[in-house]
Amino acid sequence: MANIRPALALRNALADTINTALNAGSGPATIEIYSGTIATNADTAIGAQVLLAVLTCSDPAAPSASASVLTFSSITGDSSANATGTATWARIKDSTGATVFDCSVTATGGGGVITLNTTSIVSGSPVSITSGTLTVPTT
């Protein structure tokens, strides 16, 4: 099996590059949580997926990476969800609205990049993420 094992300095630089992309523009990044099938890639326009909630990152989103981990600063929840549905994925955007990346959303223990205590979102109810980390793998 072919693989790459980047040095810690490179892993930190990769995480910091994501952080730089999150912090583009003059305001905070956002986390848009959707139901439905995740887009083919982060450049694919949203189709029939339903926007359930929008959360707001701090500005900047995170301090510099340490030990190849980007630890997000506080994330402001959505006090009133946009729609009712099952959260399955998220699109993370910078303050200009440009997509930075898409990722999976699952309930705690489900292995998603974003984990929620429940993926059942109810319109008008609060949605929150208490913490967030992004880890650049060692292989």
Residue ranges: model-predicted function:
Residues M1-T88, D94-T139:
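Small cysteine-rich, disulfide-bonded extracellular modules of the LU/uPAR three-finger superfamily
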